[in-house]
Amino acid sequence: MFQVRDYSLLSFFYFMSTSTIITAAGKNSRMRKDQLSRGIELTNKLILPFNNKTVIETTIDNALSLNIDECIVVLGHYANEIKDAIFENYKDKVKFIENDPVDVGLSVSLYNGLSNSTSDFALCITADQPTVTAETFRNMIEVSQSSEDPYNTISILRRRKTGWLDTAEGLGMPFVAPRENLMRYLENENDNLNPILRKIFDDGYKFYGIKEKNEKELLNINHYDDYLKLLD
């Protein structure tokens, strides 16, 4: 199993440029529904407090700590609300782009982010993954870029098995992929990511499942109860 033993080795692999794409463009519909049913003030899940910051700020900071080439945040629904909360703190560190139109699938958001980058590889993250640590992201990058064929390899946070995978079922972000190759699969798609990842797998790409550092790394914040679990 791949695992980073010496992070100084990463500098060897960074001749292949890497960007981070963070998607923050969703409808927030399940969280809003839960907040309404509980009589809680409506607040976008990405700007809920977490570890003395907000959810999205924690995710961004984890990505920035990797010192990779660039960080791009893709906004869509509630773009103004999110930017009002975080823009001043990140305007010099992050490139913000906005979907137009906003009512598009996750694949479009990711494509728009990738198309605004010039890197060789992309670390693709959703903004509601603040518990995925920089260590896990580093493992993904190291596995991707030290593999025998980096441009035919995707390293991804595991959902079931770890190591080399025999299926892409159930997989999603975060993952590291060759940027231009991934864009070819996303172009003209308006869908969730798993069907596209399955197509990539069927075309012969090798997928490597990275083990989580702890259980919370596998938790996305879709419902209010998910958010409460993160605070435990």
Regions found by a protein language model. Give the residues of each.
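Conserved core of the sugar-phosphate nucleotidyltransferase
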Residues: 131-225
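Short catalytic helix/loop segments, enriched in acidic residues and glycine
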Residues: 37-58
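Structural beta-sheet core signal
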Residues: 20-22, 72-73, 123-124, 156
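Short beta-strand-to-loop acidic/aromatic patch adjacent to the donor-nucleotide binding site
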Residues: 120-128
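Conserved N-terminal catalytic core of the sugar/cofactor nucleotidyltransferase
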Residues: 2-4, 12-13, 55-121, 135, ...
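Conserved beta-strand segments of alpha/beta enzyme cores
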Residues: 46, 93-95, 206-208
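Short glycine-rich anion-binding loops that position phosphate/pyrophosphate groups of nucleotides
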Residues: 26-29, 78, 101-102, 127-130
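N-terminal nucleotide-binding beta1-loop-alpha1 segment
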Residues: 16-40
